[in-house]
Curated annotation (Swiss-Prot):
Keywords, alphabetical: Amino-acid biosynthesis, Branched-chain amino acid biosynthesis, Leucine biosynthesis, Lyase
Gene this chain is encoded by: leuD
UniProt-listed GO biological process terms: L-leucine biosynthetic process
Lineage: Bacteria, Bacillati, Actinomycetota, Actinomycetes, Mycobacteriales
GO MF annotation list: 3-isopropylmalate dehydratase activity
Descriptive protein name: 3-isopropylmalate dehydratase small subunit
Length: 196
C-alpha cells in the first residue's frame, strides 16, 4: 500500500446522498477477488448518462470525491473501495459514511474523511465554478480548494496506517522478527505455518 501524506488533484462534486455500494459498483461486476478490473464498473449505471459528473471535463480525471451524506451504505463490498481506488480516487469526503465502508477504505489505502455538510456544499460550489484543484493534507487533516482550507476528521489509527502505507499484511510484516522468534521456540509437535 502506498503512503498517503498529501495529494493534489481534481476535486469532484458528487451531489448525491445515500450512495450505496451497489450504486458505487453494481453486483454484476463482482466476479473477481483481485483488486483490479473494477474501474469500468464504478458508478456504471450513472456513467451511461452523458451528463453524469464523471463524464464531464475536468471531473473525469478526478481523484478527490466530495459526496453527499451516507456514502458507502449497503452491503460490505470491498469491490466498491477497489473500484474507487482503481479509477484514481485517493480520497472521499462526506458528512456521513457507512462504518463498514469506511473501515474497508482505510485498510485498502483510500482516505475517507468526515466533513461538515456545510463545508461540503461550499466545496461543491467552488468545484462547479471551476476551482477544481484540490489538495488533501492528511498530516494537517485539511482539504484546500481554491485557496480555502477546510478541516476533516479521521481517526488517529487509520490516519497513522495511511501515512505509513500499512495494510493488514504490512502491519503483520512489521512484526516478522518477533513472529519468527516465537515460531523457532515452538515444540515440533505443535502445528505451524509452512511457507509454500
Amino acid at each position: 500500500m502506498e503512503k498517503f501524506v498529501t495529494h493534489t488533484g481534481v476535486g469532484v462534486p458528487l451531489r448525491v446522498s445515500n450512495v450505496d455500494t451497489d450504486q458505487i459498483i453494481p453486483a454484476r461486476y463482482l466476479k473477481s477477488v483481485k483488486r483490479t478490473g473494477f474501474a469500468d464498473g464504478l458508478f456504471s449505471n450513472w456513467r451511461s448518462d452523458e451528463n453524469f459528473i464523471l463524464n464531464q471535463e475536468p471531473f473525469k480525471e478526478g481523484s478527490v470525491l466530495f459526496a453527499g451524506p451516507d456514502f458507502g451504505t449497503g452491503s460490505s463490498r470491498e469491490h466498491a473501495v477497489w473500484a474507487l481506488a482503481e479509477y484514481g480516487f485517493k480520497a472521499v469526503f462526506s458528512s456521513r459514511f457507512a462504518d463498514i465502508f469506511r473501515g474497508n477504505s482505510g485498510k485498502a489505502g483510500l482516505l475517507t474523511g468526515l466533513m461538515e455538510q456545510e463545508d461540503i456544499e461550499l466545496i461543491w460550489k467552488q468545484l462547479e465554478s471551476g476551482e477544481t484543484e484540490t489538495t488533501v493534507d492528511l498530516e494537517a487533516r485539511t482539504v484546500t480548494v481554491g485557496g480555502n482550507s477546510y478541516t476533516f476528521e479521521i481517526d488517529d489509527y487509520t490516519r497513522w496506517r495511511l501515512m505509513e502505507g500499512l495494510d493488514d499484511i504490512g502491519l503483520t510484516l512489521r512484526n516478522e522478527g518477533d513472529i519468527e522468534a516465537f515460531e523457532s521456540t515452538r515444540p515440533g509437535f505443535k502445528p505451524r505455518v509452512v511457507a509454500s
